[in-house]
């Protein structure tokens, strides 16, 4: 597990491109037969990827968390961004097709990931601290109804799927979902916003090899950008905007954790407030 320490926005103003990338970009989440994890000191979230091959991968952080097992004091949200796979929780197995979600509550000791029938599943997960155990629950993308947002003039027509949240799958503090941009649309989260009460992470998906997303971050009057490829994720501190424009349309998995559990709790930034 790799540590990602919190950084003050005054320090970020002076970062080079490589410093920005080393603190905020997670560019190697999916290595076959490996569990990859990043521990962010922004609201103590763990962000990771599991790419099981012929054998199961167990959700295990060794002694990093100083607990007897990973979910002893944590909850976790999982999405399969690869081919069909399964997540075993104790004696129960949950088959996840592409872009299906699974929430697992605090206290579940044995969790493992596997691919099915020679396929190559890829599981992306975000874990946050928890104080109560909520039931394990699966959400199939095919059974969800998205919010349709945006317009052609702003090049941001998209489908927003809220999965783990106050009015969906219940959790302690974790919120998670996916946004999918229509073809010929490339902007997300613009006009921008911040939410000083919680952090956020974006995993960018459905990009061709030569396509990129320019992810905008930083304080509204001190913006910076990261060039992000397919299946790469970005950490967004509470003080930072999080927006992007792609060279093609794309999808992104968003996840939040922190003080407030209300999805609409955000501070909008007017366009003339960006620099």
UniProtKB/Swiss-Prot annotation:
Annotated residues for binding of Zn(2+): 193, 195, 200, 242
Keywords, comma-separated and alphabetical: Isomerase, Metal-binding, Zinc
EC number: 5.3.1.17
Entries under CDD domains matching the protein: cupin_KduI_C (cd20491), cupin_KduI_N (cd20294)
Keyword Zinc annotated: yes
Pathway annotation from the record: Glycan metabolism; pectin degradation; 2-dehydro-3-deoxy-D-gluconate from pectin: step 4/5
Free-text comment on the cofactor: Binds 1 zinc ion per subunit.
Entry's induction text: Induced by galacturonate and negatively regulated by the KdgR repressor. Is subject to catabolite repression by glucose involving the ccpA gene.
Highest taxon of source: Bacteria
Cofactor: Zn(2+)
GO molecular function term, any single one: 4-deoxy-L-threo-5-hexosulose-uronate ketol-isomerase activity
SUPFAM superfamilies: RmlC-like cupins
Pfam short name (any one): KduI
GO biological process terms, semicolon-separated: D-galacturonate catabolic process; D-glucuronate catabolic process; pectin catabolic process
Reactions catalysed, as given in the entry: 5-dehydro-4-deoxy-D-glucuronate = 3-deoxy-D-glycero-2,5-hexodiulosonate
Family: Belongs to the KduI family.
General function of this protein: Catalyzes the isomerization of 5-dehydro-4-deoxy-D-glucuronate to 3-deoxy-D-glycero-2,5-hexodiulosonate.
NCBIfam families referenced in this protein's UniProt entry, alphabetically: PRK00924.1
HAMAP family: KduI
Protein known as: 4-deoxy-L-threo-5-hexosulose-uronate ketol-isomerase
